[in-house]
């Protein structure tokens, strides 16, 4: 493993990241490049994001994420989620807001006739979405892109239970301070997905600045497990990196059962 102290602000992922870590492009709003934001700061916390710079105007929009999922409309016409994840090495970054795993090209998510490329996945503690007003201790987001204005993010909840073997591998490589390094060990991401892929679906946004409203959200109904020790280990590195619940503002939450 080789450390690369190359810092990238996680907030700007919405604008453009290519699916290959060797050709990764990040487009940052020019007036927001050096803007610092936090989850709970009195000057740069969540309620101030929209005012930190003009490029963050979507943070005050009407289709923001996360939401509390309370009731949904079954929709039999919704296409299922077809995951085609390859074994991959990852570039791992602790950017102070989350721990992000940028994946090699080759892993895809197909929804109907559209195929999205997996860009990266990252963690939030506690979960960002709620289900019937209840939080989970962890939520992982798999970020996929079809175009700069068309993202599909799959949210997966962790619940306390049996030890998760794949999560143990990730924990062993979590950077405890800001920085980026490459993990050359190939991993199969299928271990971070439940067997049953039933989901909730709604239209929303990125949950961090610039809060771009370009995301098709698919929150899986079924959780994966991690031991209490594993969850505590993650929280010892990074916790409370979650956005508050946003208003639904007339949006409809659909669901599909497998």
Region roles according to the model:
Residues 5-14:
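Sec-dependent N-terminal signal peptides
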Residues 16-19:
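C-terminal motif of bacterial Sec signal peptides marking the signal peptidase cleavage site
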Residues 3-5, 21-258:
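Alpha-carbonic anhydrase
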